[in-house]
């Protein structure tokens, strides 16, 4: 067992994390926000990479909301090499698009969110290919978790293995009561490899996460809500998109808020959850400081004084 770090070393690590977060906050400030704006797109336009992943930038009253729709029906939306490549490309573009305010990940295949890794494709891999493939899944899911804007997983169907790990990488999860969710890898004599062993305990607690992973238990929407795995559960509608509609409602609630503040708030929460309270409060202070000099903060105060809705520009 490694020796415990000295108090001074822990202090240095905490101070280093605060400085790192402060630097990240600074990059999210007005100067960075003003750069790299994406060209205006038409109503609910579609960026056609391939049909397996549809990227829609919503418009009009939904401007700023982006929907990633997984559309791989023949593979139950399983994570293939090609789908991972498209997800990676889409996420890479979205993280630097300052017009993006909230991202929703959903399925466009009825009854399925994502069935996990493509096991048929994996069965054809040489043993030397499996490790890098799982590493790619983990990397793409990590990239989703690290997106600077709020992310919502709309689970209207089956979310197993890597599919649930994909949802766990999102800030908020909503599901239909008929949805099925579980980390079932132990049934295949493996373990969750896309972050599930780390994110599930952080979402629902260590003991319950162990129970679910050890048993490979599958939960429905009501059960998932009861253990805190999802934030909202809805009765499925005739169209089969109840979770997506709820996700869209939540995303609309986020739109009026200050864009820089939203990004900095997410950074403060995410980083603060990984450290002790004292360090977390220092991270909050560093993040708050980045909002003070923004034009949006002044606009918020002026709008309050004038009793009107604020007109934030992300500056």
Swiss-Prot record:
Q: Which GO terms describe its molecular function?
A: enoyl-CoA hydratase activity; itaconyl-CoA hydratase activity; methylglutaconyl-CoA hydratase activity; mRNA 3'-UTR binding; RNA binding
**Transit peptide, start-end:** 1-43
Name the Enzyme Commission number(s) assigned to this protein.
Answer: 4.2.1.18, 4.2.1.56
Q: Which residues carry this modification: N6-acetyllysine?
A: 76, 89, 120, 180, 187
**Primary site of residence:** mitochondrion
Stated role:
Catalyzes the fifth step in the leucine degradation pathway, the reversible hydration of 3-methylglutaconyl-CoA (3-MG-CoA) to 3-hydroxy-3-methylglutaryl-CoA (HMG-CoA). Can catalyze the reverse reaction but at a much lower rate in vitro. HMG-CoA is then quickly degraded by another enzyme (such as HMG-CoA lyase) to give acetyl-CoA and acetoacetate.
Q: Example GO biological process term?
A: L-leucine catabolic process
- This one is known as Methylglutaconyl-CoA hydratase, mitochondrial
Q: Does the keyword field hold Metal-binding?
A: no
């Amino acid at each position: 067992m490694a020796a415990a770090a000295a108090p001074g070393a822990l202090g240095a690590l905490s101070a280093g994390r605060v400085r790192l977060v402060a630097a990240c906050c600074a990059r999210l400030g007005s100067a960075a926000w003003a750069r790299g704006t994406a060209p205006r797109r038409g109503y609910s336009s579609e960026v056609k990479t391939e049909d397996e992943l549809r990227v829609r930038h919503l418009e009009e009253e939904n401007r700023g909301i982006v929907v990633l729709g997984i559309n791989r029906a023949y593979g139950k939306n399983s994570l293939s090499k090609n789908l991972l490549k498209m997800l990676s490309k889409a996420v890479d573009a979205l993280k630097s698009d300052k017009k993006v305010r909230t991202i929703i990940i959903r399925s466009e295949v009825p009854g399925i969110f994502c069935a996990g890794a493509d096991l048929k494709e994996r069965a054809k891999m040489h043993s030397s290919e499996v490790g890098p493939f799982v590493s790619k899944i983990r990397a793409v899911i990590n990239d989703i978790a690290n997106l600077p804007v709020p992310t919502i997983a709309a689970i209207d169907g089956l979310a197993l293995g890597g599919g649930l790990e994909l949802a766990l990488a999102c800030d908020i999860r909503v599901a239909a009561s008929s949805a099925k969710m579980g980390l079932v890898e132990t049934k295949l004599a493996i373990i969750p490899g896309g972050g599930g062993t780390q994110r599930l305990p952080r979402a629902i607690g260590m003991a319950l996460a162990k129970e679910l992973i050890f048993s490979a238990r599958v939960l429905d929407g009501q059960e998932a809500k009861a253990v805190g795995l999802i934030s909202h559960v809805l009765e499925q509608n005739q169209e089969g998109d109840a979770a997506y509609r709820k996700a869209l409602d939540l995303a609309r609630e986020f739109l009026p808020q200050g864009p820089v503040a939203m990004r900095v708030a997410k950074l403060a929460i995410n980083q603060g959850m990984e450290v002790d309270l004292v360090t977390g409060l220092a991270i909050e202070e560093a993040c708050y400081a980045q909002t003070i000099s923004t034009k949006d903060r002044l606009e918020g105060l002026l709008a309050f004084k004038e009793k009107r809705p604020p007109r934030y520009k992300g500056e």
